[in-house]
């Protein structure tokens, strides 16, 4: 009897242990399904605000728009979370394992992961060689008759020294105009607009200020549309736009000068196992056709 009782107790322990392992395994699988992006669960779509040049370029490059009554309509799914700057976008994606977003390639850091798009890695070199096709211009926008100091700053941006600043900060330079030979005029310059252009503009400001301490430069971060509007109205001397000018803006007297090319990186949380995505999949996610990570293969 004692031997039989011991055997029953032993079997009971084995059964309990087996159940425990099964329960823990189920819990682990459930946890993986709910906490790890790319292995189930809904996609959290994050976009930029209306007026953002990055959003405008993104929807155009990925075809997230339709022509209705002769006008382009943004077809971004209405359940998308909206962020108002590059930094907020990165913070939002880094804090949500199921999130997807997009940012200026020049602003990319290790807090998020950039996906390869159509098999090409998001790098400045791949933009130069044409394999990574998701790119757009960085423009500075002015109206007629800029001040002497504003004109001198623009000459610096376009110079060999200015374009070196662009390249050193992981953007793609445009053809430079040679060595900077400014006259170091004094005065204040107000620069306003795109949060994507702002980081490189801050670096250009620093480099120019070293050469011309007589200039005072104030940078106001907002979005591309605000930058263009402020340049046209005289609120700022230079507008920043991370997109091409609209015909309506040109008709009002806005003039754009390309100072760099930049890619748009499609980003996910670092815990997301996904590394590659196609342009069509990005479009389907942002139009709401695809809603789950299980649908991305």
Regions found by a protein language model. Give the residues of each.
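Sec-dependent N-terminal signal peptides of Gram-positive bacterial secreted proteins and lipoproteins
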Residues: 7-35
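Short, Lys/Arg-enriched N-terminal segments with co-localized hydrophobic residues
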Residues: 1-6
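Exported/periplasmic ABC-transporter solute-binding proteins
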Residues: 28, 33-297
């Amino acid at each position: 009897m004692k031997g039989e009782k011991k055997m029953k107790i032993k079997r009971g322990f084995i059964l309990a242990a087996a159940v425990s392992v099964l329960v823990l395994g189920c819990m682990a699988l459930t946890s993986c399904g709910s906490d790890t992006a790319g292995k189930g669960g809904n996609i959290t779509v994050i976009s930029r605000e209306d007026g953002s040049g990055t959003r405008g370029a993104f929807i155009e490059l990925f075809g997230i728009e339709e022509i209705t009554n002769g006008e382009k309509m943004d077809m971004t799914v209405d359940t998308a979370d909206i962020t108002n700057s590059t930094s907020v976008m990165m913070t939002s994606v880094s804090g949500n394992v199921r999130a997807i977003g997009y940012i200026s390639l020049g602003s990319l850091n290790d807090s998020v992961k950039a996906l390869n798009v159509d098999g090409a890695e998001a790098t400045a070199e791949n933009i130069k060689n044409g394999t990574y096709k998701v790119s757009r211009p960085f423009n500075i926008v002015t109206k007629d008759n800029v001040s002497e100091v504003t004109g001198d700053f623009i000459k610096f941006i376009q110079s060999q020294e200015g374009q070196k600043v662009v390249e050193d900060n992981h953007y793609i330079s445009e053809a430079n105009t040679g060595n900077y030979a400014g006259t170091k005029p004094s005065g204040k310059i107000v620069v306003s607009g795109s949060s994507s252009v702002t980081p490189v503009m801050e670096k250009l400001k620093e480099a120019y200020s070293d050469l011309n301490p007589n200039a005072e430069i104030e940078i106001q971060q907002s979005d591309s549309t605000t930058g263009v509007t402020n340049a046209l109205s005289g609120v700022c001397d230079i507008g920043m736009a991370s997109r091409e000018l609209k015909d309506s803006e040109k008709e009002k007297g806005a003039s754009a000068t390309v100072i760099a090319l930049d890619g748009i990186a499609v980003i996910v949380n670092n815990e997301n196992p996904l590394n590659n995505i196609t342009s069509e999949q990005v479009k389907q996610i942002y139009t709401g056709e695809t809603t789950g990570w299980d649908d991305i293969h």
